Amino acid sequence: MAKKTVWSLFDGSGIMGLPWAEYGHTVYCFNASSGNHGEYAGRKEHPLVHHVDMWIDEDFAEKCAAMNIPSPDIIFAFPDCTEIAVSGAKHDSHTSLVSVDNAKMVQEIAEGFGAKWMVENPVGKMSNHWRKPDYYFDPYQYGGYMHGDEESFHSKMPAYDGYTKKTCIWAGGGFVMPEKKPGPVNIGLFWGWRWLGGNSQRTKQLRSLTPRGFARAVFLANRGANQ
């Protein structure tokens, strides 16, 4: 089985890459602990998951090469969904958002490496300022890939990631969107908005966590034959 290298950008939790690491693939999670979401509490640790604390900007690929980080076979990215214009002003009439620029950069990097790629972002203005998403999903729709005994990050977080949060996926390079397999739970709302108040880094982290069933489904659909 050929081992792959996975890059997961704007990823402080390590959730997306963990299934790959568990099957022997090497994962690099890039995230700036001084960024909007801070350093993630309870991030996923594994000998093959490498958390790299760095900012992701226009010379990101060159910096990775200088650090001798292997070229990726697949890239995942979760750009901050805060609608901030490139100018630094709150989004209103601006047409260039940081999240859109980051998403475009991910596509360019992936195409340069000939890698599969996927950008995930909640429903928002990225669709209007970049392009229509390739796919949509809610976390509960991939709950069937979970066993139900996974760690709960919060007392209000339902088992099987059984909640709604309409999420957009932009993808290319041969990325395969996995088949949906809903779990037995769907509370019909996003617990992170209903029960988490304030604007602390921990609240932002909990609201932005990658659904674990989706992460596993993506691995199964994109790992390649006989793996």
Predicted segment positions?
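Class I S-adenosyl-L-methionine
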Residues: 9, 31, 63-74, 81-226
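Adenosine-cofactor binding site in Rossmann-like domains, unifying the SAM/SAH pocket
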Residues: 22-67, 134-135
